[in-house]
Amino acid sequence: MLRIRLTDSPISLAGYWWATLVGFAWGFLWSTGPIELRQGLIVFTGMPKWTFGRGGSCVGGCYLTDRNAGDVVLGHEAVHKAQWRRYGMLFPVLYLIAGRNPLGNRFEIEAGLEAGGYVLRRRRPERPAR
């Protein structure tokens, strides 16, 4: 029996590289800010708001944003990059099926809702003075 693996496979890796090429072309076309390699991502800043979703979009190994490129957010986006590598071109389909609400989207939950800016960071309660 021939079994075709679609995740963590040469097929998904090809999809990841295709998405990275598309993300790179889109970022190169529209970015007006610095283009940097940070946390394993090609980060395109200065993008017009209509060229990406929410605070930024990870497409393959590229992160597209206007200026939302802090270290915490890039850690979140690095998880999305790993998801692109695992699922390849299945990732955008699976992401849409998971839903647009980040609080219920398994991919956003895996990447970290706090790091992605979807929920406020919890503050530690202050201890009463003795």
Task: Say what each PLM segment does.
Residues 1, 117-130:
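Charged phosphate-binding loop/patch that engages nucleotide di/tri-phosphates or the phosphate backbone
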Residues 2-37, 85-97:
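A transmembrane-helix-recognition feature enriched in membrane-embedded lipid enzymes
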Residues 12, 16-19, 72, 105, ...:
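A structural signal for well-ordered alpha-helical segments within the folded catalytic domains
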Residues 32-45, 102-118:
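Membrane-interface alpha-helices
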Residues 40-68:
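Active-site scaffold of zinc-dependent metalloenzymes
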Residues 51-52, 84-113, 123-128:
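Post-HEXXH active-site segment of zinc metalloproteases
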Residues 72-84:
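Active-site recognition of the HExxH zinc-binding catalytic motif
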